[in-house]
Amino acid sequence: MAATMKKAAAEDVNVTFEDQQKINKFARNTSRITELKEEIEVKKKQLQNLEDACDDIMLADDDCLMIPYQIGDVFISHSQEETQEMLEEAKKNLQEEIDALESRVESIQRVLADLKVQLYAKFGSNINLEADES
């Protein structure tokens, strides 16, 4: 019985204010990564839609066909070539946004890895920092 009391006392770890701040930072960054990954998926779908639109315009036979292009809440008709250029520019901008978001995810993952090392070093098996797969 004395051995189990000593084991329980050894596992009782004091959580300091700094430790709590690290745990909170880990939770905030984990939540932020989830949001960023969802945003990346939305932007990738938008990029795919733009690529599909480019492909459809290329397949159009009529070069003098006016193609409506949405700007804000209105559609403005442009020539096939102008619309193609606008779509290419939109694709380029969207890809840059995706790259920036992925870069932010990578930097947050580095912070999380560092925090995970620090927190596991102090708390060991008394803390679970692994994401739920549900």
From Swiss-Prot:
It holds the Pfam family Prefoldin_2. InterPro entries: PFD_beta-like (IPR002777), PFDN4 (IPR016661), Prefoldin (IPR009053). It is found in: Nucleus; Cytoplasm; Mitochondrion. CDD domains: Prefoldin_4. SUPFAM superfamilies: Prefoldin. GO terms for molecular function: amyloid-beta binding; protein-folding chaperone binding; unfolded protein binding. The modification Phosphoserine is found at S125. GO terms for biological process: chaperone-mediated protein folding; negative regulation of amyloid fibril formation; protein folding. Keywords: Acetylation, Chaperone, Cytoplasm, Mitochondrion, Nucleus, Phosphoprotein. GO terms for cellular component: cytoplasm; cytosol; mitochondrion; nucleus; prefoldin complex. The modification N-acetylalanine is found at A2. It comes from the Eukaryota. Heterohexamer of two PFD-alpha type and four PFD-beta type subunits. Interacts with URI1; the interaction is phosphorylation-dependent and occurs in a growth-dependent manner. Belongs to the prefoldin subunit beta family. Binds specifically to cytosolic chaperonin (c-CPN) and transfers target proteins to it. Binds to nascent polypeptide chain and promotes folding in an environment in which there are many competing pathways for nonnative proteins. This is Prefoldin subunit 4. The gene is PFDN4.
